[in-house]
UniProtKB/Swiss-Prot annotation:
Produces ATP from ADP in the presence of a proton gradient across the membrane. The V-type beta chain is a regulatory subunit. This is V-type ATP synthase beta chain. Keywords: ATP synthesis, Hydrogen ion transport, Ion transport, Transport. The keyword Transport applies. GO terms for molecular function: ATP binding; proton-transporting ATP synthase activity, rotational mechanism. It comes from the Bacteria. PANTHER family: V-TYPE PROTON ATPASE SUBUNIT B. It comes from Streptococcus pyogenes serotype M28 (strain MGAS6180). It holds the Pfam family ATP-synt_ab_N. PROSITE patterns: ATPASE_ALPHA_BETA. GO terms for biological process: proton motive force-driven plasma membrane ATP synthesis. The gene is atpB.
Amino acid sequence: MSVLKEYRTVSEVVGPLMIVDQVAGVHYNELVDITLHNGERRKGQVLEVQGDKAMVQLFEGSTGINLAKTKVRFTGHPLELAVSEDMVGRIFDGMGHPIDGGPELIPEKYLDIDGQAINPVARDYPDEFIQTGISAIDHLNTLVRGQKLPVFSGSGLPHNELAAQIARQATVLNSDDNFAVVFAAMGITFEEAEFFMNDLRETGAIDRSVLFINLANDPAIERIATPRIALTTAEYLAYEKGMHVLVIMTDMTNYCEALREVSAARREVPGRRGYPGYLYTNLSTLYERAGRLIGKKGSVTQIPILTMPEDDITHPIPDLTGYITEGQIILSQELYKNGFRPPINVLPSLSRLKDKGSGEGKTRQDHAATMNQLFAAYAQGKQAKELAVVLGESALSETDKLYVAFTNRFEEEYINQGLYTNRSIEESLDLGWELLSILPRTELKRIKDDMLDRYLPKADTTMTKVFVAND
């Protein structure tokens, strides 16, 4: 059996890859133990087997490997993660080793980090609301349990701060079920890692979180394994411990860059912009691990965060992510420059399952109606502001000026809630009604009269300030 054999037939090392000759009985995805000439031990994984040659990806890098003196042993099983409920509240490196100074975990079991394929028939439909405390998400782009809703960011935007805000504020309403956050950070700097660890510790959110950190100077292969390790942890907590788990993965762009690096080392034919042709398939093996299962109490919800290179939403990473996931939250450079935090651009953002997680019994009966009216009013106000820039304020009607006033207050009060303000869904809904009261009742055509009678506050026209676009 290959598990009993030790090979000294390493013929080539290229970047993070190693070629072992004269192998027998070796299988794809098999875990590999590597012993260097100085006794140092490293781990690897079989990427490909052709005849009697095996290509092994190295998790700890290839520095210091002596071809003639390196010993290789194939273990006969895939890379597995030791899991335990005691992982909650702990901090790990990208390979699942504790780095917080705490005790070693006593594993309850070992799980393959690639998980198991979920039969579509076994999936339950996501329809339960998750409150993030952020109005632009909870009210306008509702997140539900089992959904995968990515955040599309740009260079220099505060996506790390947004990720930390969601991690500490997210909660399940009207439920006694346990809620946990699994946070996977890939390719981040030491300063960013310190920010995440300190923020979760200082706010107490670490007590319900599991944090995996892969630094920018860690091997690219480890970066590929980190999200799989995080998702394996989430599936264990969800399906075996009955917890509702929110998985936040940042930055998926760094993950895809690692895929491209390994693909280039394998001399594969590149696809769009040099990324491997199987990028879509590879991303789907991560994103499709979100969901709910019939007969299982827990759920896995995903918020992958990625930075769009050159703010290009047609770039392969956001483009392919959008095909797999159920919407997107888009951050805006313009809103960020104007000082709005978080700078969520609500008009191009979308949650395809928002209708399933809102309404009476989940949030409130006026949720959908106010959401649609806010979208319509904000879009019309943006159009009025653009018209004022071209033709001047005098070209605006009185109604247009009210839409401009609404748009400015919407951005300043609703979107610009701050990175440390936790709003309940009721507070977001009430604020939405307050802003809609700026407009004449006749303009609120997407809300039924009985709902207007119940929720719409009387507008104080003496206090309404009209801001023009070029103020």
